[in-house]
Amino acid sequence: MSTITTSSVASSNGMRKNGKNWHDSKKPFRPTSGLTSYEKRLEARKLQEAVKEHEREMREEREAERKAQIQKIKDRRAAKEEKERYEKMAEKMHRKRVERLKRREKRNKLLHS
């Protein structure tokens, strides 16, 4: 009977690939595996995600401010160009005609936008 039990124990482990069954089977070397509990890891992960979310919000806010500033500059430049264009037109033609063209262009701009 003793031979049956020893063979069943040996067969449960299986044969080693190199055939040295007299050596103990090695276990993986994980020195830090049991140091922190699962709850602590979950808590740290939640904290990290909250920090990342806050950073993402701050980044988006900064980007929105930047885009608003860029749009403001573009609008200012467009207004300046339009003003210069009307001044050039005023040099060439009468003041009343320039005002009439301004009104017409504003109407068209409102219709198309």
Curated annotation (Swiss-Prot):
Skewed-composition ranges (Basic and acidic residues): 38-92
Name the record gives this protein: rRNA-processing protein cgrA
Cell compartments where the protein resides: Nucleus, Nucleolus
Coiled coil recorded as keyword: yes
GO cellular component: nucleolus
Biological processes, Gene Ontology terms: rRNA processing
Biased composition (Polar residues): 1-15
Taxonomy, superkingdom: Eukaryota
Region (Disordered): 1-113
Task of the protein: Involved in nucleolar integrity and required for processing of the pre-rRNA for the 60S ribosome subunit.
Composition-biased stretches (Basic residues): 93-113
Family: Belongs to the CGR1 family.
Keywords: Coiled coil, Nucleus, Ribosome biogenesis, rRNA processing
Chief site of localization: nucleus
Any coiled-coil regions, as ranges: 37-100
